A protein has these predicted regions:
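N-terminal low-complexity, acidic/polar interaction/targeting segments
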Residues: 1-244
C-alpha cells in the first residue's frame, strides 16, 4: 500500500491511508497542526509514519459522523506529508502535516484498520490565454476585498497580511488565503472543490464580500447594544440621583 511503489503517472491512482477531518480543510503548501482521536485515524497516521507514506486528508460533510463512508466525505482533499506526531494519550495524537497537492477521492475502503483511499492528482486548471484579462480583474477585486477585510480585522497576524499583500500569484493566493483567513470550513471546502483558477478567485471574492457584510452588521448591532446600555445606565444614574 506504500505510495512509493506506485508508478508515477499523472492519472495513476494512489492508495493512501486516510484521515477524515472534522471542521478542517488543509490546502497544498500549508503546514497545519491538528488532533486525531479516532482509532482508524490514529492507525492511519501510525502506518504512514512506519511506511514513510503520505496520507490523504479530506473533510467530512457532517462533523457529527463518527464512522464516515465515502458518501460522508467531500470528493476533493489533499495529499499530505506527516511531519511530526506527538502522542498525548492512548486516545489522542497531535499531528503536524504539510499539504502537498490537491487530489480527488475515487474510492474508499473502510474495512481495514484505517480508512484507505484511492485518489488521483487533481491540479487546478490555470487560466487560458483568453482568460488572462478576467484573471487580472478577479485578482484586483480580491486584493480590494482583502483591504476591506483587513480594515475590519486589524489584529490579523502580520506575517499573513504581509504574505497576501506582497503576492501577485493568483494560484498561490487561492490556497494561502482560505488556509489562513477565518472562513467557515464549508466555505474553504467550496474553494477546494473549484477546478479552475478563475473559479477559485471568483469564490474567494464572494467570500470576502460576504464576510465584510457580516462584520459590518455585527458592528452595527454591537453599537446599538452599547448605546442602549449607556442609555439605561444614564437613566439609572439619574433615577438614583433623584433619591439622594
Amino acid at each position: 500500500m506504500s505510495e512509493k511503489v506506485t508508478i508515477k503517472v499523472e492519472r495513476k491512482e494512489l492508495h493512501l491511508p486516510t484521515i477524515a477531518l472534522r471542521g478542517l480543510v488543509v490546502f497544498p503548501n500549508n503546514l497545519v497542526h491538528f488532533e486525531v482521536g479516532r482509532e482508524k485515524s490514529i492507525a492511519a497516521v501510525e502506518w504512514a509514519m512506519a511506511n514513510n507514506s503520505n496520507v490523504f486528508l479530506v473533510a467530512q460533510k457532517e462533523m457529527e459522523t463518527s464512522e464516515p463512508t465515502q458518501q460522508d466525505l467531500y470528493t476533493y482533499g489533499v495529499v499530505a506529508e506527516v511531519k511530526q506526531v506527538l502522542r498525548v494519550s492512548d486516545e489522542l495524537v497531535k499531528v503536524l502535516v504539510e499539504g502537498k497537492y490537491r487530489a480527488k477521492l475515487t474510492e474508499l475502503d473502510t474495512t481495514g484498520d484505517f480508512l484507505l483511499s484511492a485518489v488521483r492528482s487533481a491540479p487546478v486548471r490555470a487560466a487560458k490565454p483568453e482568460e488572462a484579462v478576467e484573471t487580472e480583474a478577479l485578482l484586483r477585486a480580491l486584493k480590494t476585498g482583502f483591504d476591506e477585510y483587513l480594515g475590519m480585522n486589524p489584529r490579523l497576524a502580520k506575517d499573513v497580511v504581509f504574505t497576501i499583500v506582497s503576492s501577485d500569484d493568483p494560484m498561490f493566493l487561492t490556497e494561502y488565503m482560505p488556509a489562513n483567513l477565518l472562513f467557515r470550513y464549508e466555505d474553504k471546502q467550496a474553494v477546494m472543490n473549484e477546478n479552475t483558477l478563475n473559479g477559485r478567485l471568483q469564490r474567494l471574492v464572494e467570500m470576502l464580500r460576504r464576510e465584510c457584510q457580516v462584520m459590518k452588521i455585527e458592528k452595527e448591532i454591537a453599537e446599538k447594544v452599547n448605546e442602549s446600555m449607556d442609555k439605561n445606565q444614564r437613566d439609572y444614574y439619574l433615577h438614583e440621583q433623584l433619591h439622594i
